[in-house]
Every structure is written in C-alpha cells, then in structure tokens.
Amino acid sequence: MSITLSRPSLSRPSLSRHPSLTLHSSLSHAPPHHRPVAFLRHPTLRYHHHGRLLSVASAILQDTAIRQDTYIWTPVPISRVLPAAAESLFKVIVDLSRSPDLVYNFVSPGQYVQIRIPEAIVNPPPRPAYFYIASPPSLVKKNLEFEFLIRSVPGTTSEVLCSLKEGDVVDLTQIIGRGFDIEQILPPEDYPTVLISVTGYGMSAGRSFIEEGFGANKRSDVRLYYGAENLETMGYQERFKDWEASGVRVIPVLSRPPPNWNGAVGYVQDVYLKDKPIADPRTTGAVLIGNPNMVEETRGILVAQGVSREKILVTQD
C-alpha cells in the first residue's frame, strides 16, 4: 500500500522520504511518516509438515505479514459537501451518529483516518486516501460529525468525495496516530510564544489544533504562518477573524499572489525569519504541519535558535 506525496508549491522542492506511502496531491496534509497499520490479534500457532510447533515469534511474524494492510472499516454517511474556496476546495462532512467508536477515539488534533470509496459508488474505486480530521475533538463530541478539508483532484478519492451527496456512504478506518503532544507546550504561562506553521491542506489539522484550544489568549505571542498558492486555495479564511480574536495572529503567505496582494509572499519559513524575533527560545513552542520540506527546514531553524526539539510538535504515529 502506498501513498503518493506531491510537492506543494509552498516549500522548496524535495523528494519524499517515505516511499511506502502515496498521497494524492490534495492530501499534502496527511502525515508523511505514516506507515500501514497492522492489527495483530491472538496469533495462531502453526505446525509445519514435520509436526513441530513453530515458535510463537515465527507465528507472530506470519500473522503480521498476513495482516499488514488490515484496517477496521466503518461505513458512514455523507452529511454535507460544501465549497471551501474558489478553486476545487471543499469541506466534506460525515455523520458519526451511528459510529460511537470513531467519536470516542478521536481525542487529539492531528489524528487522521483513511477513507475508502465503496464499489457501489465507483467501480473500480480509486485508491483509499488519508485525511486529517479538521474538526476539533470537543466539537466532534457535540455534533457527532467529522469535517475534512479536501481539494478535488481528478481520478482520485478526493474527486469522488467532493462530488458526493447527502446520504452517500463511504468507509472510514479507525482513528490513526496520536496527534499533537500538546502537553509539551502547557501551561500557557510557561510557553508564551507559540509558532504554528502550516502549508496547503495541512490546515485541516491546524484548524483542529487552534479551535480545540491551547490557551492562546493566555500567551503573549501566538502566530499562524499559513502558506498556500493563492487565496483561491486557502481554506478557512472565514475563520481568521475568530482565530485572531482567540489570540492567534494569522499571517497568510502566498507563493503565487495576485498583483494587488500586500501580504507575505514566498515560503512560510522565510517569512518567519523576516518577522520579529522570538522573545526567548526556552519558552517557545511550535506546531508544524504540511509539506515535509517545510517541516524539516522550520524545525532546523528553530532548533538553531535554541528552541527545544521536544517543544516543536508534529503529528505522531
């Protein structure tokens, strides 16, 4: 099973370091470090033709090989598909009212699922794809819905998802990953500076992080560097005012700006370097989401400035 990782225009070109994963170009938000998950139940002991019992370790290895691509799939209906920006960007919302396990196990921003299109909708179906959950966990518990920020790309799962109607049913895996280790930057009084750098549709996890709450209004310097090609590919612009009101300074960064654009231009990591210096690296945290090249470059910059690696959050398997 593989995911193709496209290169968003917001970061310098780089080859994917994760050949075992393929990611549709609309899925630059999916965790680049993800590996297929195997669910190992009680291994069955096997005998070879001489009747000798294979070792438990050997049985486990065999069982793992058989189950290496196994997921637990849950059918869920589409609730709504809404336009999120002008250029083929959509909010896809699924109904979890009959899927309590998905609701219960989504506990941290940065967690994600794989989505599969059933043959009843498209036959043959496109390859399943990974998507960050854009809803904050607390809102999911209340509304019993997952929202995904998805760009429609021809010939992919994303294109089908963005064309579905209310009541259409898709399959979701169990929740994958542990999300962001937010405890590393708590309490807010001890880490008054938090830098959030996001590229492309990584804003799904970014929205979940910001709206779940991390005490932004109790910190003195919280910045969101949000990179996209242009405003037509930048999701959640309608939420920027609310994020600003919560204590997050939003800095849109465009790699292909229109002629009348007066904001930041280029790579988010370069825009950060041109911004005001952080007050104290020892009391600074960061959240990095999106293109692997941006994540690695930004992490390197922050570490060189004295920020602890433990305080630089990325999603966890």
Swiss-Prot record:
Looking up PANTHER family in the UniProt record yields: F9L1.8 PROTEIN, PTHR47215
Region of interest called Disordered, as start-end residue ranges on this chain: 1-29
> Which InterPro entries does this UniProt record tie to the protein?
FAD-bd_FR_type (IPR017927), FNR_nucleotide-bd (IPR039261), OxRdtase_FAD/NAD-bd (IPR001433), Riboflavin_synthase-like_b-brl (IPR017938)
The residues covered by the FAD-binding FR-type domain are 71-182
Q: What is the lineage of its organism?
A: Eukaryota, Viridiplantae, Streptophyta, Embryophyta, Tracheophyta
Tell me, what is one Gene Ontology molecular-function annotation carried by this entry? oxidoreductase activity
The protein's name: Fruit protein pKIWI502
